[in-house]
From Swiss-Prot:
Any GO molecular function: metal ion binding
Name used for this protein in its record: ATP-dependent protease subunit HslV
Source domain of life: Bacteria
InterPro entries xrefs: ATP-dep_Prtase_HsIV_su, Ntn_hydrolases_N, Proteasome_sua/b, Proteasome_suB-type
Function comment: Protease subunit of a proteasome-like degradation complex believed to be a general protein degrading machinery.
GO CC entries: HslUV protease complex; proteasome core complex
Source organism of this protein record: Helicobacter pylori (strain P12)
Length: 180
């Protein structure tokens, strides 16, 4: 269902300093054809305090972004309260329950996956989350690199997405990364 991208979020602490990164590839696929190689599917929200990225239908993803950003603003940037209210509001609207998109949202303290069905999932370790067609490749690579390699966080995100890009035909290695 969510062919055409990979998004990876990574947060934690290194040397006593908290960090948060999100990265994504630039490929947009329509059926079996690549229509764009340098799309931007990540952005920062609420005065650069929250990072987000999407996978899935572009129009649906923009609906997700708009709704989430409105709620985030109303909660003054409180990510936890925002995802809870997002889920509650989502369940009330029949149209929204059918969106074919997912988002990762994170800040220095939390990382969540928001689905087009209104589900909110906190990353298992509250550290790494991935979505999209290459999400499992990127997640596996990021977990391995986090556990065994001593890479800077930005480099870990970049290398994990490169691995996904090498394996997933709907993901390329034209990678963009944002950080807090």
């Amino acid at each position: 269902m969510f062919e055409a991208t990979t998004i990876l979020g990574y947060r934690g602490e290194m040397g006593g300093k908290k960090f948060a990164f999100i990265g994504g590839d630039g490929q947009v696929t329509l059926g079996n054809c690549v229509v764009k190689a340098n799309a931007t599917k990540i952005r920062s929200l609420y005065h650069n305090q929250v990072l987000s990225g999407f996978a899935g239908s572009t129009a649906d993803a923009f609906s997700l972004f708009d709704m989430f950003e409105r709620i985030l603003e109303s909660k003054k940037g409180d990510l936890f309260k925002s995802v809870v209210d997002f889920s509650k509001e989502w369940r009330k609207d029949k149209y929204l329950r059918r969106l074919e998109a997912m988002m990762i949202v994170l800040n220095l303290d939390h990382i969540f996956i928001l689905s087009g069905t209104g589900d909110v999932l906190e990353a298992e370790d509250n550290k790494i989350a991935a979505i999209g067609s290459g999400g499992n490749y990127a997640l596996s690579a990021a977990r391995a690199l986090d556990h065994f390699a001593h890479l800077e966080p930005k480099k870990l995100v970049e290398e994990s997405l490169k691995i996904a890009g090498d394996l997933c035909i709907y993901t390329n290695t034209n990678i963009k990364i944002l950080e807090l």
